[in-house]
Amino acid sequence: MKLSDLLAGHPYTVLRGDPALEVTGGLSDSSADAGERWLFVAVPGRRADGHDHLHRAAAAGAVAALVSRTPADLPEGMCVVRVEDTRVAASLAAARWFGEPGRAMDVVAVTGTNGKTSVAAMIESVVTELTSAPVGVIGTGGPRLGGRPVPLATSTPTTPQPVDLQRILAHLRDGRARTVVMEVSSMALAQHRTDHVFARTAVFTNLSPDHLDDHGTMAAYKQAKLRLFAGLCERAVVNADDPVAAEILTLMPAALTYGIDAPAHYRATDVVVTPAGSAFRLQHGGRTHRARVPVPGLFGVYNALAAVAACHQLGHAVPDILRALERLPQIPGRFETITTPAGATVVVDYAHSTDSLEKALATVRGFATARVITVFGCGGDRDATKRAPMGAIAGRYSDLVVLTSDNPRSEDPEAILDAITEGLRGTDAAHERITDRRQAIAHALEHAGPGDIVLVAGKGSETYQLIGDRVLPFEDMRVVRELTAR
């Protein structure tokens, strides 16, 4: 495909070469992955800048490069084109290279601070049960098709970079997926990764403080989320109980709403929460439906409402959707539970922000018959302002808090625990510090008796622990199972 065709309609300046040349190998934003007759996209990153690797890409065989600034030394024989933002151009070029795969499927894009993975899993489960075609998923658990992992590398944990994203979408299209559910992170929106996904429906779950180390302010964080509803989707499903809903409705007045407190197109009333799940009456279109989901907590009801609305927009009948949700399997790392031989209940959850931790603990405390023991930490090289508040939340709802490591990265784990401890000081909870996460979980389990609930929070279904430059295998639920099987 000609470089000029990949960029047609997008302004650019030719610094060297002929943009009519053919790119036949592929696209990459990594010089290490570039090959013969590839297009290399120079993207500035946190640790490295692609502009510094043009010669490496050229040596690997790349015939063209997109840049956002003029390098001092242009490689011989390489067509170099300057654009205002290489991320924006990369999204366009990647979509065209792979034949705009998003247009061939019903893409449901789910964004929000909390609930993305759960809502996506619910939609996947419902559509899988109600249709014969395999369902594609792109998100925190990695891409999958028909419930099986897709053997394609992803560049970021939640929403891949544009070339990887379009490659995965093309794989799902070629695998005959008709519906794709994808989690969309705020950074993906801010960096234009999803600009040419062509989402049929976008779902907004909620907004609360998180990722401020990336965005700087809540205003910038919110604006990143709002990008999805400013021309990147055809329809919207919005949480009416979140203050941001009003702004989304200004952008998309025809958006459908769901909620519990505010009037909404899909509203839950008479909510009953038990350890086994949540029951409610769904009010929609002048009719009342009995509903039940095997997920405890109000957050489970909100996630179910979002899934119902999205699946209804895909053309499925509400009664069929509700029946499918009743049979929802446990979502790995999302309020995933197991009972120990001692009679305690262990809950593994991804709660890693102030809002999500408080919701998880409020749910646990709501049906606890004995003690609540919380095991958690905070990520290193990430927003440090949430550490003390999360400590205060844990202390307010727990009888015992076991502080531990959660991807400390380059930071001193003890320094992170010091910051969390500041928030614990004003609470009545006992607390202990065990930086080794496995030992911390073991300690909590050893002290958990009949009726106690142990919440292991922060990592969810993650399969690694980041310590310094090392990526070590670690999975909370696997560790819990190993320790309780002794």
Residue ranges and their predicted role:
Residues 1-15, 34-39, 49, 128, ...:
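ATP-dependent carboxylate-amine ligase
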Residues 1-92, 96, 243, 267, ...:
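N-terminal leader/targeting and accessory segments in enzymes
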Residues 6, 38, 57, 93, ...:
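Residue-level signal for inorganic ion chemistry
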Residues 9, 71-77, 174-175, 182, ...:
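Acidic, Mg2+-coordinating active-site environments of NTP-dependent enzymes
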Residues 16-18, 67-69, 84, 139, ...:
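Short loop/edge segments at beta-strand edges and connector loops
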Residues 67-70, 184, 206, 240, ...:
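Short secondary-structure boundary segments
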Residues 72-74, 143-145, 188-190, 243-247, ...:
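Short, active-site-adjacent cap segments at secondary-structure transitions
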Residues 89-240, 246-253, 368:
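Phosphate-binding loop of NTP-binding sites
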